[in-house]
From Swiss-Prot:
A Gene Ontology cellular-component term: cytosol
Ligand binding (ATP): 9-17
Protein name: Cytidylate kinase
Signal peptide positions on this chain: none
PANTHER family: CYTIDYLATE KINASE, CYTIDYLATE KINASE/PANTOATE-BETA-ALANINE LIGASE
One Pfam family this sequence matches: Cytidylate_kin
Annotated compartments: Cytoplasm
Keyword vocabulary terms for this entry: ATP-binding, Cytoplasm, Kinase, Nucleotide-binding, Transferase
Biological process, per Gene Ontology: nucleobase-containing small molecule interconversion; pyrimidine nucleotide metabolic process
Domain of life, source organism: Bacteria
One Gene Ontology term of the molecular function aspect: (d)CMP kinase activity
Coiled coil: none
Length: 220
């Protein structure tokens, strides 16, 4: 078994930035589980399905699904979905489908297969509680809504997407509510997670703190 690091937290808390940099620093693999959920959600949507579709219909589509995550790009049945999952709509679709037990069951199995026997940094919303409950280090990142809105807005603007601050705030509030209140694997810190509030911390400060924790765990 490799050394597994779980990083959880709400949208725009800094998970992706930190997880990617941490993996690079350590020479570990990196998995963004949110990207796998968005890709599957977009794929199901393209197949004409919604979160209110019959479970059997969704099961039939998912049972033979193949997901690959390579160098930050996500592939479904060999097709690159990376660009398709960048829109706010993809995030909303992902939150809707992620509430379904049938979707989470398939994705958790696939995510565990990707992580098996690897030194890996895995980011998401239920990594420390569901996907990798025995991870060597569990981190839960959080930040104020205001800070997260600013980060998400900059991210969208960098991609050339025209969205207002109000739209981003509504999106995050909606996603927070869905993520924390869903019946299956709600967003919450694992009991043994280290909680880090990134509101007033720089990326370097967060990274340094986690690297220190990694070194401590590796030496015990």
């Amino acid at each position: 078994m490799g050394f597994q690091i779980a990083i959880d937290g709400p949208a725009a808390s800094g998970k992706s930035t930190i997880a990617k940099l941490l993996a690079e620093k350590l020479g570990f693999d990196h998995l963004n589980t949110g990207a796998t959920y968005r890709a599957v959600a977009v794929y199901l949507h393209e197949k004409g399905l919604s979160s209110s579709s019959a479970e059997e219909e969704i099961e039939n589509v998912l049972k033979d699904l193949k997901i690959d995550y390579v160098n930050g790009r996500v592939y479904i049945n060999g097709e690159d979905y990376t660009e398709k999952i960048q829109s706010p709509e993809a995030g909303v679709l992902a939150s809707n489908f992620a509430r379904l037990e049938v979707v989470r069951r398939h994705l958790v199995r696939i995510q565990r297969e990707i992580c098996d026997d690897k030194n890996i940094v895995v980011e998401g919303r239920d990594i420390g509680t569901v996907v990798l409950p025995n991870a060597h280090l569990k981190i839960f990142l959080t930040a104020s809504l205001e800070a997260r809105v600013e980060r998400k807005l900059k991210e969208y603007q960098k991609r050339g997407l025209k969205v207002t601050k109000e739209e981003v705030e509504r999106e995050l509030i909606s996603r927070d509510e869905q993520d924390s209140k869903r019946n299956v694997a709600p967003l919450k810190p694992a009991e043994d997670a280290v909680i880090i509030d990134t509101t007033s911390m720089s990326v370097e400060e967060v990274l340094d703190r986690i690297l220190k924790l990694v070194r401590e765990r590796m030496n015990t």
